[in-house]
Amino acid sequence: METLDLSRRGVLLNDEQLGPYPLEKLKRVERLTVDIVEDSPRVDEKEMAFAKCRLGGFGDVLKKRMEDFTVRVPIGASYYHFQKYLNDYPENEVAPEKAPLPEDTRIVTRHIKKMAYFTGAEMVGVCEVPRDVYYATKVDGTPVERVYRYAVVFLVRTQLPTIAASHGDEWLDDTVAYQAYQRLACMSNTLADYIRRLGWPARSDAFNNYVTIMPRLVALAGLGEFSRLGIVVNPFMGAAFKAAAVLTDLPLVPDGPIDFGLQNYCSVCKICAEQCPMHAISTGEQEEYRGYMLWRTDERRCVAHGAANPHGCTCGRCAKVCPFTRSEEH
């Protein structure tokens, strides 16, 4: 009996939309839409704003406030603690024999994306991971020595009805963030476990367990562009999303960055800067920051408000008022 060539019939490889958002309609470009200094050095995780604040880099008062950061509200604390246990879940070993996967890496890539959507992801992209995207060391000083070639990056929407009911910088913002982080930790650990069972190394890269600078992965995987907010904005979700990834050596096909005109848009739209309670968002031009040409955010002002916020903790006013976020509020 003749073997049915499923890939030729378009069952395993086709152009059908995988998730709820039409990513195939986006304009793909060869490079990110911001200029990059190619030889930018790897940075230590302790240099990230919230880690620096927790370690006392912004003073003892803010360091003290960080002791109960994210756990001041019962529901936020519940999400935070369970998400932490997911990160600490022991990894299974990589299977000693590799599964007989198709030789066409496009088929494998599409399958892995489908699995990511199956776990609950709302948007998925793939990229190669430059070495400078990996941290040099973790917060505790442990070197990040193991690097992987590819990243499967996925996003989930933060809950829009809750964001719409919030003014952006009270306890609700923290809760919707950790609700998303918990889901992402479950998804990324599940997908990494699955890939290891196929015989390929893989690890979850989720909040509180990152070894990469996640916004860069999101942009490289074609899931957004760098914005005036200082974070990545997605053309469908705006800034109301959270991200995680699975890092792996399983050969995959990268998607490539996107260009939906955000650099021009952000150059004239300054709503986020106008609405920022601490005036931490730049109203000026882009400048070099850690090897990238970006709109600089005053990290100390931003984190200080989040850590010492009398209404809760963290702040998401900029993400709430971004026009790309608000487009789906109703």
List each language-model region with its residue ranges.
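Catalytic cores of enzyme domains
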Residues: 113-114, 118-329
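Iron-sulfur (Fe-S) cluster-binding modules
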Residues: 1-124, 147-148, 320, 324, ...
